[in-house]
A protein has these predicted regions:
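Membrane-interfacial terminal anchoring regions of lipid-handling membrane enzymes
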Residues: 1-104, 111-113, 118, 135-137, ...
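Short, basic, glycine/proline-bearing loop/turn elements
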Residues: 128-135
Length: 459
């Protein structure tokens, strides 16, 4: 994250989408090379692409508007979807004799915070690709209006991650946010007001990563690094496998929990489950889950107490509120006119920004674990689940150490499978949605629930 985050600044500006067809052409030409050189991905395949081909045909004929609701386990997901658009959809369309207008693309909705930690150039790239940003944790009416307008009137379909962010787990879907469903109903409303009879659809898309060759040795080496960093003795396994590495992973997780529990009880005067209470839980995984839940709640409380926020809702909702509160302390309305601010006021503002960033650090730790359970590996002990869990622990340690590295270690070459699901019709549900506010809320909830089940079925 850039050092500028520690200084008080004017409010975050909206980055308007400014689609540049020439820039998209360059990106699509370079994309396969970029994926080969900059990611661990060696193969991308897709299932039910013909469904997407037909949807694009209908979209281009003016019959439908649709949004792709895609799984978001990793930051590589947009590259995979862009490959689907630029390579796989045109290929399948040609094989089926379907004429599509090129380019095949989508207007992505992305988190406005990404350019803050990934670099301002990312905002420029996203804008020129026709993407539109939104701020999490608040009613970002400017961002919502932009997304709503693109859904109804954009040159391309929409694409968004209903989970709201990455969770690092290919086979565990976070609880979906209702925004995708709400945008769908708004689109249906806008089309009706404009006298347009296009159908509105939401299309679930699954993305799943797997290793070409099981990287047990790389996982073992990473475990050794994490053990050394956390003060545990390093005892490399002679033969790396789930049987030999799982006890080490459990021991590492328990040790890290102990360190963090001491950190919060000693220096932040928080109360956590005592050893006697935990000792009564016979199963190690269950004990870990209980301790982790208590620790995550405590870490968020530290942030919430500073920003005077109520501790309500899911962990993800609480994280987003903390993030928005932190941004409000850093990106301030009263700093719009920097020239009119005295040196003392600026220095005080920087102090507030620095403290806000420090308090947000606790929330960043929690963010990595919002979808983690104590049984993810045990219920299906694959190398993918083991690697994902180990990488989450790596991310936690990296945040504690203050490492600036954005990218996770690459443990081995991966292949990606994208699955296009059955479209969910918003237009069919719109008459019931129109009834009253209660019916509208119920309609959004039902679509969100159906989308959740559909995406879980694509794993």
């Amino acid at each position: 994250m850039a050092d500028v985050i520690y200084q008080a600044q004017p409010p975050l500006e909206f980055i308007p989408p400014a689609f540049n067809p020439l820039f998209l052409r360059v990106v699509q030409l370079l994309l396969p090379t970029y994926i080969n050189w900059q990611t661990a991905i060696t193969q991308i395949e897709a299932e039910n692409v013909e469904v997407l081909v037909d949807l694009y045909r209908q979209f281009q004929e003016g019959k439908i508007r649709f949004m792709l609701a895609f799984r978001h386990p990793k930051t590589d997901d947009p590259f995979c979807l862009s490959y689907l658009f630029s390579q796989l959809v045109p290929k399948v369309a040609r094989s089926h004799g379907t004429m599509l207008q090129l380019p095949i693309h989508a207007h992505f909705i992305y988190d406005r915070g990404i350019p803050l930690w990934a670099g301002s150039y990312v905002g420029w790239i996203a804008s020129n690709l026709g993407a539109t940003p939104i701020q999490r944790g608040k009613a970002d009416w400017t961002g919502l209006r932009s997304a709503r307008n693109l859904f109804a009137n954009g040159k391309f379909p929409m694409a968004a991650a209903p989970e709201g962010g990455t969770n690092g787990l290919s086979e565990n879907i976070s609880t979906l946010e209702p925004g995708i469903a709400q945008l769908g109903f708004w689109c249906a409303e806008d089309l009706q007001k404009a006298g347009r009879d296009q159908q509105v659809l939401i299309v679930p898309v699954g993305i799943k990563y797997s290793y070409v060759d099981a990287p047990w040795d790389a996982i073992a080496n990473l475990l050794s690094e994490l053990e050394a960093a956390s003060g545990l003795p390093v005892n490399p396994s002679e033969f790396a496998s789930v049987e030999s590495l799982y006890p080490r992973l459990l021991t590492l997780a328990e040790h890290l929990l102990s360190l963090m529990e001491q950190f919060y009880t000693r220096f932040y005067h928080q109360k956590l489950p005592d050893a006697k209470t935990i000792g009564e839980i016979e199963d190690r995984n269950e004990a870990l889950a209980v301790r982790l839940k208590a620790l995550l709640n405590t870490a968020l409380l530290i942030s919430e107490q500073y920003f005077d926020l109520q501790s309500k809702g899911s962990l993800r909702d609480r994280c987003q509120r903390v993030e928005q509160a932190g941004w409000n302390y850093i990106f301030r309305e009263d700093f719009k006119d920097v020239k009119g601010i005295s040196a003392v006021e600026r220095a005080l503002g920087d102090r507030v920004a620095e403290e806000a960033n420090a308090r947000m650090w606790h929330m960043r730790l929690v963010e990595s674990f919002v979808a983690v359970s104590g049984n993810y590996i045990r219920e299906n002990p694959t190398v993918e689940r083991f690697a994902e869990t180990t990488l989450i622990l790596w991310q936690m340690i990296a945040k504690i150490k203050g490492d600036k590295a954005v990218r996770r270690p690459q443990l081995g070459k991966q292949k990606v499978k994208i699955t296009v699901g059955k479209p969910i019709s918003i237009s069919e549900r719109y008459p019931a949605y129109q009834g009253n506010r209660l019916a509208a809320r119920q309609g959004v909830a039902e679509v969100t629930n159906d989308l959740q089940h559909a995406m879980e079925g694509l794993i």
